[in-house]
Amino acid sequence: LALRAPGLGEVRVQALASGVSRGTESLVFLGRVPASQREAMRCPFQDGEFPGPVKYGYASVGRVLDGPAELAGRRVFCLHPHQDRYVVPASAVVPVPASVPDARAVLAANLETAINGLWDAAPRVGDRIAAVGAGVVGALLGALAARIPGTRVEFVDPDPRREALARRLGCRWAPPERAHGDADLVVHASGHP
């Protein structure tokens, strides 16, 4: 399909990588977005309506092909659905530092979710924090929480492969049946009720 040229204040982006959310996008793909959540789950630049067909996604890293001189040729992150090229307002893209590989840059949307989760949970210095689920969002949340002085962060996840990740991030790991029951704060990030 032909893609229109960018107008004033817009950029044309060639996608390099796109992240797929196992939880959210599984609901979208299967047409199971609850009617009560459809407006909240709309993503920027979404095309179509729930339950579908719908063009969805919100984790694109690409290179600016055309646009303002300060962005031309730069790698950028955009909350855009999965497609190989797109035109968006220049204000919708964020430059990606050269030191950040594409595979990490696509996690920016997940990192935003983890940060918002911590803001809402309001952990305090010295809190014992349990992150239920050590997938992408849970791991990012745990990594951030572990930087708060005096905290003890424990990933509660049935997958024993998460133990090595927990250690690398300065956290503990336990399967549900061995989790500490003394948490001051519990954040559910498993994607499963």
Task: Mark where each language-model region is.
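A structural motif shared across PLP-dependent enzymes of the aminotransferase-like
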Residues: 77-90
